[in-house]
Amino acid sequence: MNSVHQRRTPFSIADILGPSMVPEAPSAPQLPEAGPDPASPLCALEELASKTFLGHSPRATPQPSEGRAAPEAPPGPGAGVRRRRKSRTAFTAQQVLELERRFVFQKYLAPSERDGLAARLGLANAQVVTWFQNRRAKLKRDVEEMRADVASLCGLSPGVLCYPALPDSTSSPDPGPSGPDSEPNLSDEEIQVDD
């Protein structure tokens, strides 16, 4: 029974560490390749698992009949040559200032605008694209955090009506003609406080 358990667990210590790290059992009887019912779900699962994990075992090599190309480097820590990532771009203060200034007015740039901005700032087009993507993600995180803060403040004071402090995307950006009556004024009737 012990050998059956070892055969069907590709996650055993011996399989993970490999033969050099774990002492071999004195003589474990080998199981036949096919069980009593080769069409059983357990046998199919075992066959799939053995094919799936065959390339991950340091002592096994993939068979050409599997339809996969053999890996050029053995898997493992530090194995294989990876492409180096580009180093992180350090933008100058002037570049960041200009990018932020443009972002305030325009969250998305047309390709021609992006090319012009990149040329003016001495950056690659991809750097400008990446900066704007990252800045939009940061804005989204900041807005969600502020909304959560407002919601938590409203939860602390249930007697006070909370009005959204952040602009809603459905509201128009232009409030209309400005004047003394155009600004929303809060009166005592609008703020209900339980005494």
From Swiss-Prot:
Single GO cellular component term: nucleus
Domain of life of the source: Eukaryota
Stored InterPro entries: HD (IPR001356), Homeodomain-like_sf (IPR009057), HTH_motif (IPR000047), LBX_TF (IPR051892)
GO molecular function, one term: sequence-specific double-stranded DNA binding
Phenotype of null mutants: Mice are healthy and fertile and do not display any abnormal phenotype.
Pfam families in the cross-refs: Homeodomain
Region feature Disordered, mapped onto this chain: 1-89, 164-195
Keyword Nuclease included in the entry's annotation: no
GO terms for biological process, alphabetical: muscle cell differentiation; positive regulation of convergent extension involved in gastrulation; positive regulation of non-canonical Wnt signaling pathway
Keyword Signal (UniProt): no
Keyword annotations from UniProtKB, A to Z: DNA-binding, Homeobox, Nucleus, Transcription, Transcription regulation
DNA-binding region listed in the record: 84-143
Primary residence: nucleus
Factors inducing expression: By PAX3 which regulates its expression.
Compartments it resides in: Nucleus
Expressing tissues: Expressed in the developing urogenital system, eye and brain.
Function: Transcription factor.
Protein name: Transcription factor LBX2
